[in-house]
Amino acid sequence: MRRQDLETLFGFSYWMKDRVLECAAKLTTAEFQAPSGLTTRDLRGTLVHTLDVESSWRARLQGQPEDVWKKELPLGDYPTARALIDHWRRDEYQMKAWLATLDDDRLAQIYDLEPGSAERFPLWYYVLHIHSHTQQQLGDAAVLLTRMRQSPGNIEFLEYADFLHREGTRPEGHARVRAGRQHLGSDRKST
């Protein structure tokens, strides 16, 4: 997998995260912390866990000491979504900066997560794992928000692509789509 592809996927995750946090910020503290009988964690727990996993996996893959990436973010530090937003923006900046340092050859190298372990994969497997975990958790958060009447709306990849097109931007390294392209429109079927 190429770095520019991973940067696009992480751009999508951060766009999705922003939609989810924007809705979560409209909740009262009690709503944000309300127990969930639907998912493994409540909304706050889901979002803090998501940030924690992104941050700790990045630190681990960067070779930081175990005491840095092993500790968990305390839920009590994030009583509201607003408290979480600033931390996540800083982490997003750090993640994007780290991704920018990885070239395609580095991503293809086998990464020995635990020396001596049989589980050895290219670095891009682990980076993609961070992205897919975030997608799953943000999907859970979106379900919880929807049940609280604060739906983030459609947060699928093509919605992100349409957003970029409307903004006149595109993921780094991707050619602009020619004006004569076929338009699928908003009648796409969601899966």
Describe these PLM feature segments.
Residues 7-22, 26-74, 114-177:
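Short, contiguous alpha-helical
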Residues 65-105:
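Helix-adjacent hinge/juxtasegments
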Residues 190-191:
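Conserved small/polar residues in nucleotide/adenosyl-binding loops
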Residues 178-184:
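A late-sequence structural motif
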Residues 1:
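An N-terminal RHG(E/S)-centered segment typical of histidine phosphatases
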Residues 101-116:
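Acidic catalytic patch
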